[in-house]
Design a protein with these regions (language model features):
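Surface-exposed loop/edge segments in extracytoplasmic proteins
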Residues: 77-85
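Residues within well-ordered beta-strands of beta-sheet-rich folds
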Residues: 56-58, 97
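Sec-dependent N-terminal signal peptides
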Residues: 1-3
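N-terminal edge beta-strand
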Residues: 24-54
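Extracellular/periplasmic metallocenter environments
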Residues: 5-23, 27-28, 41, 88-123
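Beta-strand signatures of extracellular beta-sandwich domains
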Residues: 69-73
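Short solvent-exposed strand-capping/beta-turn motif centered on an Asx-Ser/Thr pair
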Residues: 52, 60-64
């Protein structure tokens, strides 16, 4: 009975992507990054790569039948684009290769779902 109640409350043990807190910051730890889209959310609110170095992003879309991408912009106005990944229909995966960015903080989002967004740190 307790297990059945727990399963009902947790959605039957289905995958739930962790989400970092608003305003999360991060620092570069390498040139191979990863991010997952699930339930119209990213599992990370902050990504980071070393400045001026090409890096890859392993992009994993777990949302069945929903296209997502990752694009990096100067800020949340999304006027100046630095990188725009192709749309990936879910479930699906793609590896994006991104030319190095100058040092600073940038904005990333899913273009079809701009509420899916975060901070990109180049340092």
């Amino acid at each position: 009975m307790v297990i059945a109640s727990w399963l009902a409350l947790t959605g039957g043990g289905s995958f739930a992507a962790p989400v970092q807190q608003e305003g999360a910051t991060c620092s570069p730890s390498g040139t191979a990054l990863s991010i997952t889209a699930f339930d119209n959310k990213f599992d990370k609110r902050c990504l980071a790569a070393p400045a001026e170095m090409t890096f890859t992003i392993d992009f994993n879309n777990l949302d069945r039948g929903i296209p997502h991408n990752l694009a990096i912009y100067e800020d949340d106005s999304a006027r100046k684009v630095y990188f725009k990944g192709e749309l990936v229909d879910g479930p699906g995966r793609s590896t994006y290769t991104v030319q190095g960015l100058s040092p600073g903080k940038f904005f990333f989002r899913c273009d079809p779902h701009p509420e899916m967004n975060g901070t990109f740190v180049s340092g």
